Amino acid sequence: MKILRTPRMERCIGCHSCSLACARLVHRMLSWDTAGIRISSSGGLSTGFEARTCLACLPAPCATACPTGAYSQRKGGGVIVKKSLCIRCGECARACPVDAIFLAAEGEPFVCIHCGRCVSFCPHDCLEMGDVATGEAERSNARESAP
C-alpha cells in the first residue's frame, strides 16, 4: 500500500499544479476548494511553501468521528470516502489532527485519498508515492505533535 508523501517541499514554487490536478482529475471540479492537497506559504515568500495533506493516520480519527460511515479506515492508513453517505456535518474535519480535511463553502469535505494523481503534475518533483512502512514514523510523529 502506498501513501502520498511530500519529501522535497524546498523545491516547491507554489504553482498549485498538484491542487488543481487533484480537484480536476479526482473530484472532477475546477476549484482549489475541492482539492485534497493544499499548498500555502510557510510564512512569507522567502520561507518557501508547505503542503497540507492527509498523513494516512492509523487509526484515522476522521473515520472514527464520522457519524454516518462516509469515512472508513483504509488499509495501510488514511480513509476511503463514500460521498453518498456524507451529511456535511464537518465532524471529520474537526477530528483531523493535522487539519487536512478541507470543507468547501457548502460544507462538503475534501481529503487526500492517496491516489497519486497529483504527483506527475508537480514540475519540481516535490511529491511522491511511498510505501506505508517508509512513512510510518513520520505519520506517528505528526499525530503526537498535533494540538
Model-derived regions: residue spans:
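Flanking helices and flexible, charged tails adjoining ferredoxin-like Fe-S electron-transfer domains
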Residues: M1-I13, A23-R24, R28-A70, G77, ...
